[in-house]
Swiss-Prot record:
EC number(s) stated in the UniProt entry for this protein: 2.3.1.117
Pathway(s) served: Amino-acid biosynthesis; L-lysine biosynthesis via DAP pathway; LL-2,6-diaminopimelate from (S)-tetrahydrodipicolinate (succinylase route): step 1/3
Family of this protein: Belongs to the transferase hexapeptide repeat family.
Keyword NADP tagged: no
Organism: Burkholderia pseudomallei (strain 1106a)
Location (main, coarse): cytoplasm
Alphabetized InterPro entries for the sequence: DapD_Trfase_Hexpep_rpt_fam (IPR005664), Hexapep (IPR001451), Hexapep_transf_CS (IPR018357), THP_succinylTrfase_dom1 (IPR023180), THP_succinylTrfase_N_sf (IPR037133), Trimer_LpxA-like_sf (IPR011004)
One annotated GO biological process: lysine biosynthetic process via diaminopimelate
NCBIfam families cross-referenced by the UniProt entry: dapD, PRK11830.1
Protein name per UniProt: 2,3,4,5-tetrahydropyridine-2,6-dicarboxylate N-succinyltransferase
GO CC term, one of those recorded: cytoplasm
Domain of life: Bacteria
Cited Pfam families: Hexapep_2, THDPS_N_2
Subunit record text: Homotrimer.
Length: 275
């Protein structure tokens, strides 16, 4: 079924300029709707780890983008306090008490998750925003004013602190989604964008900004890398001096690496403050 679905989505994508709410076959509508429904249930996901490496399913990103071409904007009531006007309804618009109980997660007002995002059991959504295509795995906390961007992949037992921004990457299509692996802590007001991968058991301090062009400096080795935080890293904001010594530019600094056992035993403040 997935292969047939992928073929329809890929073929439709090649002719997307001709697509509109009034110019789409029933087959296309059903294929896109089914893909979004599978993302919403967590049966499919935009990226998954296969044999130790992350694989991005670009056709599912195409399905998300095509869904915007198939719908007109429409009024969406918001419990009497406001009204919205958009193409994508809330994930929870038609949820019953039984649906919430089966989902096993908490949604604190006024948290918003768009249809097509997946929220796993024991997740807590504080007043936050989770966009279409995102996958939030079990036991994760999305704290107040945090944003989980389109198609971002958040692992198990992750803590996204207040005001954290996890970037969404639907366009350009070839770009990969942001991935935060299991048991990571992302400090308040930090930003992770442009397909950066934060590997498991890492701690990102408050106010760290990570994009593909951000230099990641390993204090122990002196190595500078881009786009990936190695497993078990403790990262703080820093600066690197220019070669001519006239100025310095922002970077992220890996101050130490810890294993899962140490990460579990030692408090976050101690990890971040220790030399």
């Amino acid at each position: 079924m997935s292969q047939q679905l992928q073929q329809i989505i890929d073929n439709t994508w090649e002719n997307r300029a001709e697509l509109s709410p009034k110019a789409a076959s029933a087959e296309i509508r059903e294929a896109v709707a089914h893909a979004i429904e599978q993302l919403d249930r967590g049966a499919l996901r935009v990226a998954e780890k296969i044999d130790g490496a992350w694989t991005v399913h670009q056709w599912l990103k195409k399905a998300v983008l095509l869904s915007f071409r198939l719908e007109d904007n429409a009024p969406m009531p918001a419990g009497g306090y406001s009204q919205f006007y958009d193409k994508v309804p809330s994930k929870f618009a038609n949820y019953t008490a039984e649906d919430f109980a089966a989902g096993g997660f908490r949604v604190v007002p006024p948290a918003i998750a768009r249809r097509g995002s997946f929220i796993a059991k024991n997740v807590v959504l504080m007043p936050s925003y989770t966009n279409i295509g995102a996958y939030v795995d079990e036991g994760t906390m999305v704290d107040t004013w945090a944003t989980v961007g389109s198609c971002a992949q958040i692992g198990k037992n992750v803590h996204l602190s207040g005001g954290v921004g996890i970037g969404g990457v639907l366009e350009p299509l070839q770009a990969n989604p942001v991935i935060i692996e299991d048991n990571c802590f992302i400090g308040a007001r930090s930003e992770v964008v442009e397909g950066v991968i934060v590997e498991e058991n890492s701690v990102i301090s408050m106010g760290v900004y990570l994009g593909q062009s951000t230099k990641i400096y390993d204090r122990e080795t002196g190595e500078v890398t881009y786009g990936r935080i190695p497993a078990g890293s403790v990262v703080v904001a820093g600066n690197l001096p220019a070669k001519d010594g006239t100025h310095s530019l922002y970077c992220a600094v890996i101050v130490k690496k810890v294993d899962a056992k140490t990460r579990a035993k030692v408090g976050l403040n101690e990890l971040l403050r220790g030399d």
